[in-house]
Amino acid sequence: MLTVPYLWKGAQAFPVADVTFEAARSPLTVKALVDSGASFSVFRAEVLECLRIPLSHGRRLYLEGIGGRILGYLHRLPVRVGGVRFPLTVVFSQELAVSFNLLGRDNFFHNFLVTFDERRRETRLQAYRSHHTARVI
């Protein structure tokens, strides 16, 4: 089980996790908000630029949410969170207007039992060992 302390930004604490993309010659680790209210994982397009993957190589789609409608490109990339490797389906967008990349329910939450402990200000991620796409290392 991975226990991750919340990240403090000013006076607020947020449940974040390190996500390591393994699609490049050298792995790239970024922080993302573990967001049970997000249907999909949505990351800034700059992450793809660092991985040297063209944004347009993904499937073009529009997402709608509280902040309005944004254009994004759907990609499926190998990632590692804690000691678990799995393919993450993620939408990359140049129009993402929130301060964090988002790990949403579709695909990410299928790999972990997620517990938000507000009192301790930490997130616990317990891998589902029987899941066919996740591999604990």
Residue ranges of predicted features:
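Pepsin/retropepsin-fold aspartyl endopeptidases
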Residues: 1-137
